UniProtKB/Swiss-Prot annotation:
One of its GO terms (molecular function) is nucleotidyltransferase activity. It comes from Pseudomonas aeruginosa (strain ATCC 15692 / DSM 22644 / CIP 104116 / JCM 14847 / LMG 12228 / 1C / PRS 101 / PAO1). Residues 390-429 are annotated as: Domain Ib. Residues 430-638 are annotated as: III (required for ADP-ribosyl activity). This is Exotoxin A. The keyword Disulfide bond applies. Keywords: Disulfide bond, Glycosyltransferase, NAD, Nucleotidyltransferase, Signal, Toxin, Transferase, Virulence. It catalyses: diphthamide-[translation elongation factor 2] + NAD(+) = N-(ADP-D-ribosyl)diphthamide-[translation elongation factor 2] + nicotinamide + H(+). Residues 278-389 are annotated as: II (required for translocation in target cell cytoplasm). The gene is eta.
Length: 638
């Protein structure tokens, strides 16, 4: 084949041409799709071997949208390899270490490293988006295989930004290169099997944000067969892309992609994203606060007319950027918000942004503060400045697992843990949204249907949560996220109450806006996996009692704060019961709207008992909570 100037620089930079002439490299071409569809052995003694990876150009030029899945199995026995895929990506295998390097800027490549668990065969996979308004990056991941050719370990899913030219090349006619890398073998070879490319396609839709909403999460595996089965098993969840890929068609385009049985326990699926221009904390916060795809904020160009992005995403991203630019510590968030609201005209652009939407600002800044605090705590040498631009590792966590830990090399990244959310259980009907007029398109019938589905999936109702409108939207659609709290350890967590009247008092704005208005909020229903109920405890002490902290630690078996446990006690002496969930437990909850309305004419008033629908009251019984320790102290939480 002919080496074009487009990819000569990459090949040279990798050392792929070292020790061999330009012409000899051109003579060592092979046909990956045909020769290696079943199995092939490449002789690497003379330097570079190369193969075009052509696909039907009509696929990339279609008016639809889709994903190309390239894959091949590299057999064990040769651990010293260098591979390249055009100018886009290089892969170096050196013993147990696989290094990835690539990106849109040759002088500033993104680098990732993965340590294999064994020296057996492994499968190289990369996903290329195609079609209308596609994302601007590819995904790369490794599947390790055991002696029985079963999937035994999976790397994180790595994101590498690409320019339009490179993406187009990868989708049509990329070139694959391979050579031995510092091999001690006299006759180095490489065995490849099951090389192939498949595609999933669907007709274009006008709302790009929905089509690509899972591109930056572990759920991207749900797009393709057989990766959807891998996702379902590892995450112990169900691939559910709603109607975003309705009518999608999957087919093999060339070669013979492998399908592997699984020999792996349900485990975390991790997805690592690098933000070339920094700003990852601001992007992660906007993603969480506004329930917008994280992939959105890695793009250089955004679709026009995206209301949620313009009304929430951009303002939140700008707000966090302003806070960072002011060089304020994240433990000052509450005071900064109070000062901005108490003194109109103060605080510059940051103060103005807070006053424009105070509750959205409170939600966003407390989320960002919690992420920064967790980042600083999780790695030696991490600091608040590093949190602003660290990589993001999105973790899809098995529901029934214990602590959801990131990969060993993720201590320098912002970690986002993802569990099922209320959005998956809302059923058919109009879009759900929260306003002072009530929860739009939500009915008692939809509530009952959601409740039944949750029970079938192993969830149990544990109480109500009252909050302001922006938080309700974020919690139902994006899940509960830890927020910073300027409180003693015993009070830190997510608050719920079995009595809706108690939660009702919190269903309002926390602060008045610039005109002194406080809006009514929303009541939500909180469900936890039934398997987590042994971690629920009850005490007769008020949590304000001096001896309460010691009593709670005795019950939960580890020092405060709460983690995968909860404590229920009276809000005051002789008062109603409230429950605090530890943030790691709260992240596992599924939260859906209640059908109990809040009254915009009586904000801060008492709940009218007659407003509670009989059918909702009938499904709101609480489980029993333990009042004595039911398990030994957790060593990992001491």
């Amino acid at each position: 084949m002919h080496l074009t100037p487009h990819w000569i620089p990459l090949v040279a930079s990798l050392g792929l041409l070292a020790g061999g002439s330009f012409a000899s490299a051109a003579e060592e071409a092979f046909d990956l799709w045909n020769e290696c569809a079943k199995a092939c052995v490449l002789d690497l003694k003379d330097g570079v071997r190369s193969s075009r990876m052509s696909v039907d150009p009509a696929i990339a030029d279609t008016n639809g949208q889709g994903v190309l899945h390239y894959s091949m199995v590299l057999e064990g026995g040769n651990d010293a390899l260098k591979l390249a895929i055009d100018n886009a990506l290089s892969i170096t295998s050196d013993g147990l270490t696989i290094r990835l390097e690539g990106g849109v800027e040759p002088n500033k490549p993104v680098r990732y490293s993965y340590t294999r668990q064994a020296r057996g065969s492994w499968s190289l996979n990369w996903l290329v988006p195609i079609g209308h308004e596609k994302p601007s990056n590819i995904k790369v991941f490794i599947h390790e295989l055991n002696a029985g050719n079963q999937l035994s370990h999976m790397s994180p899913i790595y994101t590498i930004e690409m320019g339009d030219e490179l993406l187009a090349k990868l989708a049509r006619d990329a070139t694959f290169f391979v050579r031995a890398h510092e091999s001690n073998e006299m006759q180095p070879t490489l065995a490849i099997s099951h090389a192939g490319v498949s595609v999933v396609m669907a007709q274009a839709q006008p709302r790009r944000e929905k089509r690509w909403s899972e591109w930056a999460s572990g759920k991207v595996l749900c797009l393709l067969d057989p990766l959807d089965g891998v996702y379902n098993y590892l995450a112990q969840q169900r691939c559910n892309l709603d109607d975003t890929w309705e009518g999608k068609i999957y087919r093999v385009l060339a070669g013979n992609p492998a399908k592997h049985d699984l020999d792996i326990k349900p485990t975390v699926i991790s997805h690592r994203l690098h933000f070339p221009e920094g700003g990852s904390l601001a992007a992660l916060t906007a993603h969480q606060a506004c329930h917008l795809p994280l992939e959105t904020f890695t793009r250089h160009r955004q679709p026009r007319g995206w209301e949620q992005l313009e009304q929430c995403g951009y303002p939140v991203q700008r707000l966090v950027a302003l806070y960072l630019a002011a060089r304020l510590s994240w433990n000052q968030v509450d005071q900064v918000i109070r000062n901005a609201l108490a003194s109109p005209g103060s605080g510059g652009d940051l103060g103005e942004a807070i006053r424009e939407q105070p509750e959205q600002a409170r939600l966003a800044l407390t989320l960002a503060a919690a992420e920064s605090e967790r980042f600083v705590r999780q790695g030696t040498g991490n600091d608040e400045a590093g949190a602003a631009s660290a990589d993001v590792v999105s973790l899809t966590c098995p529901v029934a697992a214990g602590e959801c830990a990131g990969p060993a090399d993720s201590g320098d990244a912002l970690l986002e843990r993802n569990y099922p959310t209320g959005a998956e259980f809302l059923g058919d009907g109009g879009d759900i949204s929260f306003s002072t007029r009530g929860t739009q398109n939500w009915t008692v019938e939809r509530l009952l249907q959601a409740h039944r589905q949750l029970e079938e999936r192993g969830y149990v109702f544990v109480g109500y949560h009252g909050t302001f409108l922006e938080a309700a939207q974020s919690i139902v659609f994006g899940g509960v996220r830890a927020r910073s709290q300027d409180l003693d350890a015993i009070w830190r967590g997510f608050y719920i109450a079995g009595d809706p009247a108690l939660a009702y008092g919190y269903a309002q704005d926390q602060e008045p806006d610039a005109r002194g208005r406080i809006r009514n909020g929303a009541l939500l229903r909180v469900y936890v996996p039934r398997s987590s109920l042994p971690g629920f405890y009850r005490t007769g002490l008020t949590l304000a009692a001096p001896e309460a902290a010691g009593e709670v630690e005795r019950l939960i078996g580890h020092p405060l704060p709460l983690r995968l446990d909860a404590i229920t006690g009276p809000e005051e002496e002789g008062g109603r019961l409230e429950t605090i969930l530890g943030w790691p437990l709260a992240e596992r909850t599924v939260v859906i709207p209640s059908a109990i309305p809040t009254d915009p004419r009586n904000v801060g008033g008492d709940l009218d008992p007659s407003s509670i629908p009989d059918k909702e009251q009938a499904i709101s019984a609480l489980p029993d909570y333990a009042s004595q320790p039911g398990k030994p102290p957790r060593e990992d939480l001491k």
